[in-house]
Amino acid sequence: MLTSPTRAWIVAALAFVLAAATVALYFPVHHYPFVSLNDAEYVTQNVRIQQLDWDSIVWSFTTFHAANWHPLTWLSHALDYHLFALAAGGHHLTNALLHALNAVLLFWVLWRATGYVGRSFMVAALFALHPINVESVAWIAERKNLLSMMFLLLALGAYRWYAARPRVGRYTLVLIFYVFGLMSKPQIITLPFLLLLWDYWPLERVAGRSSPFALRQSDSRGVSGEKRKAISEERSGEQRSFGWLLLEKLPLLALSAASAVITVHAQRSGGAMGGALRSYSLVVRLENAVVCYARYLSKAIWPARLAFFYPHPVIVHLRQVAMASLLLLLLTAVAVALRRHRYLLVGWLWFLGSLVPMIGLLQVGGQAMADRYAYLSFVGLFIALCWGVADWAKQRRLPNSCVAGASLALLLALMIATHRQLTYWSSDLALWAHTAQVTGNNSAAENMVGESLQKAGRAQEAMEHFRNAAAIDPLLPYPHYHLGVYDEENGNPQDAILQFKRVIALTQSDTGVLAGLRANTFTHMASSYEATGDTANAERATRLASEEQHRDWSFETNTRP
């Protein structure tokens, strides 16, 4: 039986192995520093989280700082600062422990819902060890990804408990976990959709032909028991019509709608939607979304050339769009055709659906895609893969030792790849140099390599990368700023003024996000004007610098009330 002491011990032992392997794999992050992108905004230069008091709590629940509303994430960082101050290792280890906890929760949720120990363990192991998730764990500012996933998994577990015996109290627990997840990061906004998939499989709450993917009578053999060895009594609840199950999700959908409104407002307030520098047309965003679905699939199968930042293409080639569309349609057709294996359809739709908020239809930032967006979506692919391979091996009557050996070899290969990917996070320079190398024509990466070299005292090398960044994307203001500062410091005030004027022109439409950059630019421009004897323009630049400082949103997190 599923609840026998022997099986419980096996599950506990596997959970321990899973957690231990995950922590051991990610333990090197204990020696890694904060990275330049967002870690300062979230921790090192954010005095609001550096005192765990009532003012910080109020600020966490009322701010849209960093273009997000995620109060539990802010409180998590505040607690970490209370424990570790600015020792980056402690913050990193918290992320590693949360990732290990999420892996164990995923194992537990799948096991309780399906009755399969081995398959559930393999899904959780792929989730824990796949290198695509390095970004979510090694980046301290991405704590929000880990927290939201934890609450989503708890909501899934609570929903299975509710489905076994629907009660208001049990449903309320699902709502609570969902609210906590949204207060950590709103990317789990697709939970109601995932729960409908959960109803279809593995809970099988959808009654007969009411399902949008109802099987013909001749195709329905073996569905309810895909030959599970044991099923918990708690799992068997009443079947309902699809309409009733959809109605059941209305409170969750209301929370999703509220979160969407808050998120859009926060992103627009922070200048993330459309970016402060460039916006892309809807056609380009649609084309990029289709291509990126295919790119995510390729990285799930062969996780090579992973990068911190993938630049958004200005033009997407129609051939790429056509091939990606054909692939997605083909895989969808296969999943529907083989829907008697419900896990295939559920896994595929999980992948497609959970990526919708992050696929770029609404532009948030300047990236085409991001490894961190795979943290939730790849779970669907892992489910389809593990259940599909296990059923195939069973049909072929392959020895369990062969399946176990192949699984172990795959996990070891992933651990090696993850360990290597983790080393790129050992410093800003290593991270951005790798990103520039594997992406190509990446102005943001070239600029960040330059900044990293500049901090290391290698100014001449840094200037080459700033020039590369400016050549790749003439609309990016940061390299012009750094080139201007270099000219100013090396006695070329006229050249410096030209660079500073470019920065101001490129950020003319800024709504406050780049006020800090503009303030620094005007300050250096004033010094350059003074060096040329132009006191009138120097005074004007000084006045404008002061005005920009009052618009600088980072000022809010660097001062206390």
Model-derived segments and spans:
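Helix N-cap/loop-to-helix boundary motif
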Residues: A87, G440, G512-A515, E556
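Terminal, low-structured helical/coil segments at or just beyond the last alpha-helical repeat
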Residues: G516, S527-P561
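Polytopic membrane enzymes that build or remodel cell-surface glycoconjugates and lipids
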Residues: M1-E489, D495, H524, A531
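Structural marker of alpha-solenoid helical repeat scaffolds
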Residues: V438, I472, L506, D510-V513, ...
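Intrinsically disordered, low-complexity Ser/Thr- and acidic-rich flexible linkers and loops
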Residues: E226-K229, T507-G516, N558-T559
